[in-house]
From Swiss-Prot:
Domain Helicase ATP-binding: 37-208
Lineage: Bacteria, Pseudomonadati, Pseudomonadota, Gammaproteobacteria, Enterobacterales
Enzyme Commission designation: 3.6.4.13
Annotated protein name in UniProt: ATP-dependent RNA helicase DeaD
Cleavable signal peptide: none
Motif DEAD box, residue numbers: 156-159
Family under the similarity heading: Belongs to the DEAD box helicase family. DeaD/CsdA subfamily.
UniProt feature, compositional bias: Basic and acidic residues: 446-481, 568-629
Length: 629
């Protein structure tokens, strides 16, 4: 086993890669990196058995990048990943690792992204292709992905691909790759199906086994909340209000998210600030100093920006965006519980991210308990307790006499009416409560939360499981929302831009988290379109839609007024009626939540989805590969 004192330079990596590692803050290789990099540099096949979060992305990326030819504009490295989230993460990492290698391009291919975007990226001759099995196989069948020059193949999280039912696609892809290439396979477990692949496709692989060293301290209380019933920003405010903390750090994935979350917290009265890579060193140090001395209570940061952060005051860590690997999670929550203090760590998990939660639990060898969203009753109780504590503090002050003298000068509104001190106290209480009212309206009833289950628990499903159509005709149809509850909006994309109704529905449903059954009539014109949406759209949602892009053009959504009645047979955009494209996903503006996505796992375009893509447009700042999604 390699010693931790080994440096990346000792492993034989060249200057451009070492420079990139230095820029990224890498100091010394992890055990799996120290073991795998020399073998891969020497052209050996490698079979790596390590948990997520062990640093395996760098373990295979660095040596394969060093061995490729930047002058050859053809795919030389192919990485297979089980989900689009992991594919994007690996593509981002390989882009960072190769940033000082001139002429090296990376493209990510996954379901849900338009084919024309991916075809444009492939025509540019990327040397590195990262993708999900289904979409990669589609490109191979279409003849749009040429692997004749491939020199390196990586199967990342092979056991996860087996669990998700992709292993046949993986074998089909591997059978089409020319001989003479190098293969690296990484898996946390080694079931027989994976062993069969190693025997069939790998040449005397060097086995590398790394036991997880990821641990967490018992003085950090951990829990997770399944994102359900309201937006993450709204839920974050509730959790912060329900928690007792000295200072908190909130981790997000992108630089833009640090600013957006900080703005949301400032609007709700929290003293917060963003910390991201765009800040110069002087501003960064100033922000951290404010956090240390108590002038700042909440910091919103990315993983990179928070490296080296050590502030004893931090007693709460919120993983607003779940990290993609277990090691990052441990590093994040390690920011709390310093100097012998107890710490709290909260993790937000969306249903599509349950695999990442399972990886964290498996690596850390513990089960993280789930918590419920603080309800209105709890918030009201907390607010009253805090207010009562402030009142008690004032009751103990020594300068109340001069204020007591003012009571006699406050006259009742009606002549002859005596001043009722209890009523006066109630009026002053109402005035003093501030923006957070002491009386919290009860929560609106929500639909029951879906079970938080793995795909394995549901078992396989095909068309024959659904029963004959005649057996399903008694199901009640959902009622269409009355037009009187709708408003008409204009968006600046139209037929001349190549937009179709499905593009608009997808953008509104996904970016606004709105059920498509709450989307009304859509009409396409040459240079613009109109769309009906429920009344009461929050300003922040409209602002988000203004920046959201469809076919790489901003929507610039504007309210035109109330929707006008129209005939029930009217079709949207001159095409298929909306009833043929509905799905039970999203929510309306009143906060009603959906029952889930489309059961067949397909987008409005009919393309297969291999796991929902992370939301991304120019307003979120998510990095893109090969064009717009």
């Amino acid at each position: 086993m390699a010693e931790f004192e080994t440096t990346f330079a000792d492993l034989g990596l060249k200057a451009p890669i070492l420079e990139a590692l230095n820029d990224l803050g890498y100091e010394k290789p992890s055990p799996i990196q120290a073991e795998c990099i020399p073998h891969l540099l020497n052209g050996r096949d490698v079979l790596g058995m390590a948990q997520t979060g062990s640093g395996k992305t760098a373990a295979f990326s660095l040596p394969l990048l060093q061995n490729l030819d930047p002058e050859l504009k053809a795919p030389q490295i192919l990485v297979l990943a089980p989900t689009r989230e992991l594919a994007v993460q690996v593509a981002e990492a390989m882009t960072d690792f190769s940033k000082h290698m001139r002429g090296v391009n990376v493209v990510a291919l996954y379901g849900g992204q338009r084919y024309d975007v991916q075809l444009r990226a492939l025509r540019q001759g990327p040397q590195i292709v990262v993708g999900t099995p289904g979409r990669l196989l589609d490109h191979l069948k279409r003849g749009t992905l040429d692997l004749s020059k491939l020199s390196g193949l990586v199967l990342d999280e092979a056991d996860e691909m087996l669990r998700m039912g992709f292993i046949e696609d993986v074998e089909t892809i591997m059978a089409q790759i020319p001989e003479g290439h190098q293969t690296a396979l990484f898996s946390a477990t080694m079931p027989e199906a994976i062993r069969r692949i190693t025997r069939r496709f790998m040449k005397e692989p060097q086995e590398v086994r790394i036991q997880s060293s990821v641990t967490t301290r018992p003085d950090i209380s951990q829990s997770y909340w399944t994102v359900w019933g309201m937006r993450k920003n709204e839920a974050l405010v509730r959790f912060l209000e329900a928690e007792d903390f000295d200072a908190a750090i909130i981790f997000v994935r992108t630089k833009n998210a640090t600013l957006e979350v900080a703005e949301a917290l400032e609007r709700n009265g929290y003293n917060s600030a963003a910390l991201n890579g765009d800040m110069n060193q002087a501003l960064r140090e100033q922000t951290l100093e404010r956090l240390k001395d108590g002038r700042l209570d909440i910091l919103i940061a990315t993983d990179v920006a928070a490296r080296g952060l050590d502030v004893e005051r931090i007693s709460l860590v919120v993983n607003y965006d779940i990290p993609m690997d277990s090691e990052s999670y441990v590093h994040r929550i390690g920011r709390t519980g310093r100097a012998g203090r107890a710490g709290r760590a909260l993790l937000f998990v969306e249903n599509r991210e349950r695999r990442l939660l399972r990886n964290i639990e498996r690596t850390m060898k513990l089960t993280i308990p789930e918590v419920e969203l603080p309800n209105a009753e709890l918030l009201g109780k907390r607010r009253l307790e805090k207010f009562a504590a402030k009142v008690q503090q004032q009751l103990e002050s020594s300068d109340l006499d001069q204020y007591r003298a003012l009571l006699s000068k406050i006259q009742p509104t009606a002549e002859g009416e005596e001043l009722d001190l209890e009523t006066l106290a109630a009026a002053l209480l109402k005035m003093a409560q501030g923006e957070r009212t002491l009386i919290v309206p009860p929560d609106a009833p929500m639909r029951p939360k879906r079970e938080f289950r793995d795909r394995d628990d549901r078992g396989p499903r095909d068309r024959n499981d659904r029963g004959p159509r005649g057996d399903r005709e008694d199901r009640p149809r959902r009622e269409r929302r009355d037009v009187g509850d709708m408003q008409l909006y204009r968006i600046e994309v139209g037929r001349d831009d190549g937009v179709e109704v499905r593009h608009i529905v997808g953008a509104i449903a996904n970016e606004g988290d709105i059920s498509s059954r709450y989307i009304g009539n859509i009409k396409l014109f040459a240079s613009h379109s109109t769309i009906e949406l429920p009344k009461g759209m929050p300003g922040e949602v409209l602002q988000h839609f203004t920046r959201t892009r469809i076919l790489n053009k901003p929507m610039n959504m504007q309210l035109l007024g109330d929707a006008q009645p129209h005939t029930g047979g009217e079709r949207r955009g001159g095409g298929r009626g909306f009833s043929g494209e509905r799905r039970e996903g999203g929510r309306n503006f009143s906060g009603e939540r959906r029952e889930g996505g489309r059961g067949d796992g397909r987008r409005f375009s009919g393309e297969r989805r291999e796991g929902r893509a992370p939301r991304r447009d120019d307003s979120t700042g998510r990095r893109r590969f090969g064009g717009d999604a």
